[in-house]
Amino acid sequence: KAAEARGEIEYKASENVANADYERVMREYATQGNQLILGEAFAVEAAARKVAKDFPKVSFLMGSSGKPQAPNFSVFDNFIQEPSYLAGMVAGGMSKSGKIGMVGGYPIPEVNRLMNAFMAGAKEVNPKVQFSITFINSWFDPPKAKEAAFAMIDKGADLLYAERFGVSDAAKERGKLAVGNVINTQDKYPDTVVASALWHMEPSIDRALKLVKDGKFTPEDYGPYSMMKHKGSELAPLGTFEKKVPAAIVAKVKAKEADILAGKFTVKVDDGQPKS
């Protein structure tokens, strides 16, 4: 939308496309003269790559766990483990019980790496912190996520990692805290969401648009452009919790953030399934 507002592009968008319809929609966009097709191929890898092969003059930038594919298929992924680590530090400092509950959708690399980074950050602040981890095997089932979160609260968790919708609702209802993922929902949960790891796609999209415009688009892994040094991710401002998070924790988080940006500290990318 920002590129459109600047008068740089015209674009069309389709939302909630079923996996069975994905290839058809991609082909329609490719045949309509669009120069760049952007989307997610996580569950439709074979179909997406097949379309790209059939339209070699069209550029594709797709969310994928796989590698770039010649001559026109670039990939991106949610490498926002850095702000996830920082959010974990905040969580470790804010949990009074030392017990944190984590509710995820599926134990896939894109979810695992963020959970593992979050856990590592929490452990830096509180090495004795304990985690409860549940996967609900769904991308969108707020009631199920909420139920899982309630179970963790009943076992002593006073802070929840909200990888799925429904978790922050559970935290709000029980007067507990939550940490958000990918987007900032603090406006909806001002007394609940203490921190969030945000993902910004603008650096990746802007790069792809420039390369297409210059006729220089080639297969590339855009993963690094989701990292903090490229402004592809960040720890959300503490907002309503600015005066509630202890100053010592804020100082530690800011120091770690500076080290990450300076290349002095690297957050490990661990795609393995996290364990309690």
Question: What spans do the regions from the language model cover?
Answer:
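A residue-level marker of the well-folded mature domains of exported/periplasmic proteins
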Residues: K1-S276
